[in-house]
Structures are given as structure tokens and as C-alpha cells.
Amino acid sequence: MEFSPRAAELTTLLESRISNFYTNI
């Protein structure tokens, strides 16, 4: 299974959204 740069980018974006969500609580 290849891990595409796009998938890595989406994962990073998702993680940053999640961390922002938790810091805003």
C-alpha cells in the first residue's frame, strides 16, 4: 500500500483541525 503525499497532507490537516478543536474547548 502506497502512502500518497495527498493522503499525508489530508492527515496533517485533519490532525491540526482536531488539535485546534480540543484547544478551543
From Swiss-Prot:
GO BP: ATP biosynthetic process; proton transmembrane transport
What keywords is this UniProt entry annotated with?
ATP synthesis, ATP-binding, CF(1), Hydrogen ion transport, Ion transport, Membrane, Mitochondrion, Mitochondrion inner membrane, Nucleotide-binding, Transport
Q: Name one GO cellular component term.
A: mitochondrial inner membrane
Superkingdom field: Eukaryota
Coiled coil: present as a keyword of the record?
no
**Keyword match Membrane:** yes
Q: Give its localization.
A: Mitochondrion; Mitochondrion inner membrane
Q: Name one GO molecular function term.
A: ATP binding
Primary subcellular site in the record, as a coarse category:
mitochondrion
Q: How does it assemble?
A: F-type ATPases have 2 components, CF(1) - the catalytic core - and CF(0) - the membrane proton channel. CF(1) has five subunits: alpha(3), beta(3), gamma(1), delta(1), epsilon(1). CF(0) has three main subunits: a, b and c.
The UniProt entry's sequence similarity note says: Belongs to the ATPase alpha/beta chains family.
- Free-text function comment from the UniProt entry: Mitochondrial membrane ATP synthase (F(1)F(0) ATP synthase or Complex V) produces ATP from ADP in the presence of a proton gradient across the membrane which is generated by electron transport complexes of the respiratory chain. F-type ATPases consist of two structural domains, F(1) - containing the extramembraneous catalytic core, and F(0) - containing the membrane proton channel, linked together by a central stalk and a peripheral stalk. During catalysis, ATP synthesis in the catalytic domain of F(1) is coupled via a rotary mechanism of the central stalk subunits to proton translocation.
Q: Report what the protein is called.
A: ATP synthase subunit alpha, mitochondrial
Gene source species = Spinacia oleracea (Spinach)
